[in-house]
Amino acid sequence: MFYLRGCGRWVAASFTKQQFPLVRLSSDSAAPRTPHFDVIVIGGGHAGTEAATAAARCGSRTLLLTHRVDTIGQMSCNPSFGGIGKGHLMREVDALDGLCSRICDQSGVHYKVLNRRKGPAVWGLRAQIDRKLYKQNMQKEILNTPLLTVQEGAVEDLILTEPEPEHTGKCRVSGVVLVDGSTVYAESVILTTGTFLRGMIVIGLEMHPAGRLGDQPSIGLAQTLEKLGFVVGRLKTGTPPRIAKDSINFSILNKQTPDNPSVPFSFTNETVWIKPEDQLPCYLTYTNPRVDEIVLNNLHLNSHVKETTRGPRYCPSIESKVLRFPNRLHQVWLEPEGMDSDLIYPQGLSMTLPTELQEKMITCIRGLEKAKVIQPGYGVQYDYLDPRQITPSLETHLVQRLFFAGQINGTTGYEEAAAQGVIAGINASLRVSRKPPFVVSRTEGYIGVLIDDLTTLGTSEPYRMFTSRVEFRLSLRPDNADIRLTLRGYKDAGCVSQQRYERACWMKSSLEEGISVLKSIEFSSSKWKNLIPEVSISTSRSLPVRALDVLKYEEVDMDSLAKAVPEPLKKYTKCRELAERLKIEATYESVLFHQLQEIKGVQQDEALQLPKDIDYLTIRDVSLSHEVREKLHFSRPQTIGAASRIPGVTPAAIINLLRFVKTTQQRQAAMNESPKTDQCLRNADRLQERQL
């Protein structure tokens, strides 16, 4: 057992009432005992909270280590969850019994479904969240989770031991060293460090170490990871200034009201806590040429923009937007930070100009002429680890039982972090009990696409989820995430409660029964026209028309269909969610059949496992170029399907790999079957003797 670095410099760490005793005395000895857990989670952000609670739900004794307990659940940047693609992740996290979706439903102040003009497969569930309420509700949930201990403290180093021979990796993590020199041991460790790895905050030309405004960065842990051999990169992000609510002239701005009724994030909720009529509006304004002028004239005062470090492509700073898209007007959404908050978040105005120039720029914008900046915008630069160094279970290739989740893997956004956190927590727990990993494939969920993109393609800029990244988005909809993942989460991972599992089973059987009934009801087109006059069905059709086909029409829903045919359809309208999901299933029925065939083809590729111990650099049984060997050696794909998605791995290389896998499988099968074959021959000889 060894520490990677020395423990010569330590500072005192503060602890809360929720701490475990760092020294425990056994009944027969006065010697101190070191605390031991099944899983340790480092970091209390959106990935860390989901990872810790997921591991605890799976039955593991879990420790959540965070710099400060009072920052658990803090929304460091935007006061919102969800959006296009991100709303799908929220539903999938909820399907695995994650926290953030339920907490959002308790804390939302403005709900909106984006992409309503398009089909339900790409609807984006989104909500403005009360920062204070969200943090309170999350902390209450975390501090009352069974098997979960919360501890304040900073991790300085990892405790490493000899690797398990049956797994890849040059060593195994078995605990952590805190900044005060104390040690805590565990079977698995999850890093969810966010922007804290060598984090630097930037405002204008000023830079100072911080993982977040007011919080110290993690230096020692970053050095440990680098010395272990992990490929480390550098990314940056930013946040807008906060504006005093009473200094804004809302009367001249475009007002956006919330949806009524609100669509909850969680499958367990039919409604949200704050009623639509009590929710808050958002307001829209735009930048102008004066904003461009201030940005362009002061680039020399902005070190964050001059840095070569890559920032988020899909959430750029106002400086980046002006440079990339000159002479354009850019949207600025004025979003409330809470029911009782005096602050407004100007979405679209992330900036790192000097503080005095930030207020000067903001007062150039319509409606903000008298705006007061309460907190300046700032940028953050931080370390991340190339995600091609982790497996689809989020365990690292280099260090056994060490898992990464969140921004450490190069992603951006609360939802992407939460999704990784759930998977890391589940797999860290399964690793302790030596069970197979829980992997979501590209054909099963947006979470699968997210992790597959990271582990096979990597990223050189903050990764954001979009519906356009998903090949099978008609099948992977927000409405059916429970059918896709809850059943698996219960059976394969043990992370889902009995109540949620039973609800998902009921919904699945109700949908199957409802679709079967809708298929069985057939009338002529003229009769349907008489029953539902508003439907634009052609009366020239000679064949009978199923009720399921009638439900596909935009003007028809389950209520109108049940009025036309009360028996047996009336019972399917009693549950609003069931009625809406039957409508969606009918809408996509014809295209889903073809997509399911494509999914089966992909699943066949994913079923072809590559040997875990294969050495791509030296193996001679397969013809591969040097470049392909290096790419495969670095990414270490687990299946033929994953290998085919790595840039630079040619179709010819995939064919050669496929031949190698099949030959290996045949050899293994022959070795396994040879004793059975000999026994069969002996039995046949004896039978022939008896017959003679």
UniProtKB/Swiss-Prot annotation:
Residues annotated as binding FAD: G43, G44, G45, H46, A47, G48, V155, S218, Q407
Signal peptide region: none
SMART domains assigned: GIDA_assoc_3 (SM01228)
GO CC annotation: cytosol; mitochondrion
Transit sequence range: 1-25
Chief site of localization: mitochondrion
GO terms (BP aspect): mitochondrial tRNA wobble uridine modification; tRNA methylation
Purpose: Component of the GTPBP3-MTO1 complex that catalyzes the 5-taurinomethyluridine (taum(5)U) modification at the 34th wobble position (U34) of mitochondrial tRNAs (mt-tRNAs), which plays a role in mt-tRNA decoding and mitochondrial translation. Taum(5)U formation on mammalian mt-tRNA requires the presence of both GTPBP3-mediated GTPase activity and MTO1 catalytic activity.
Basic and acidic residues bias locations: 683-692
Cofactor: FAD
Gene3D superfamilies, A to Z: FAD/NAD(P)-binding domain (3.50.50.60), GidA associated domain, C-terminal subdomain (1.10.150.570)
Complexes and interactors: Homodimer; forms a dimer in the presence of potassium. Interacts with GTPBP3; forms the GTPBP3-MTO1 complex composed of homodimers of GTPBP3 and MTO1.
GO molecular function: flavin adenine dinucleotide binding; tRNA 5-taurinomethyluridine synthase activity
InterPro entries cross-referenced by the UniProt entry: FAD/NAD-bd_sf (IPR036188), GIDA_C_N (IPR049312), MnmG (IPR004416), MnmG-rel (IPR002218), MnmG-rel_CS (IPR020595), MnmG_C (IPR026904), MnmG_C_subdom (IPR047001), MnmG_C_subdom_sf (IPR044920)
Protein name (record): 5-taurinomethyluridine-[tRNA] synthase subunit MTO1, mitochondrial
Region called Disordered, residue ranges: 669-692
Keywords linked to the UniProt accession: FAD, Flavoprotein, Methylation, Mitochondrion, Transit peptide, tRNA processing
Highest taxon listed in the record's lineage: Eukaryota
Localization terms from the record: Mitochondrion
Family the entry assigns: Belongs to the MnmG family.
